[in-house]
Amino acid sequence: MSTLSQPHSAEPRSNLLASFLVRFAPLALLLLATRAEHFGSALNLPDASKAVFFLAGFYFAFGAVANGVRRAGFWGLIALAVAIDFISFWLSGRETALCLSPSYPFLLPAYGVLWFGGRWLAGRLQAGGQFALSAVAAWAVAGSISYLLSNAAFYWLSGRYAEPHVAEYLARLSQYFVGFVTTPALYLVAAAALHLMFARALRGQRAEVSAQ
């Protein structure tokens, strides 16, 4: 049985909590720092939500992680994202209310796709797959599907467009696709660089210990 599916029911609660927090806390901080400003500005970073859920899927599957810890990670980030949105709505009013429309629940499958994209990448890496190529493929597929889900739901269900039709939707689809996929990719590149840096440092420490 692979490490991704081994039972961990006997694992001490303190270990489960530590396993959860070491993964959840950095991602939650990134979500808190960027989600309130969905498009970014000169003073605010662009929204990192898509990258956060992709990275969460990766890190909550990377290594031996209990299934309960994974579920808590996903639903904890969903709850945090919803809380940020509703607080933003309360503080800023009408503009944010456009996002809290009948299309809003479709963010759940959109983020779920990103989560499973990251989880697939973790499995590929642990199976010895080529990291860079697998990462690009995972993000390209998961990011595109997530965009289609969230964009289509917002266009057809939000009520923002009085007379929606296919031609206009396709035009808007292509207009925002590049930004949707590339902006989170910048966060993913930064995360990959940090991951490789810490992995290299850890290997160096282990080599020093084994040499002593």
Where are these regions (language model features)?
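Aromatic-anchored segments of alpha-helical transmembrane domains
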Residues: 27-39, 78-92, 140-152
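Short, charged juxtamembrane terminal tails flanking transmembrane helices
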Residues: 2-10, 203-212
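Short helix-perturbing small/polar motifs within transmembrane alpha-helices
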Residues: 80, 90-147
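Structural signal for the C-terminal ends of transmembrane alpha-helices
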Residues: 35-37, 56-69, 113-126, 193-202
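Hydrophobic transmembrane alpha-helices
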Residues: 2-75
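Residue-level signature of transmembrane alpha-helical entry/exit and packing/kink sites
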Residues: 19, 23-27, 73-74, 103, ...
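Alpha-helical membrane segments and adjacent membrane-interface helices in multi-pass membrane proteins
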Residues: 44-112
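Membrane-embedded alpha-helical hairpins and interfacial helices in multi-pass inner-membrane proteins
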Residues: 120, 124-204, 211
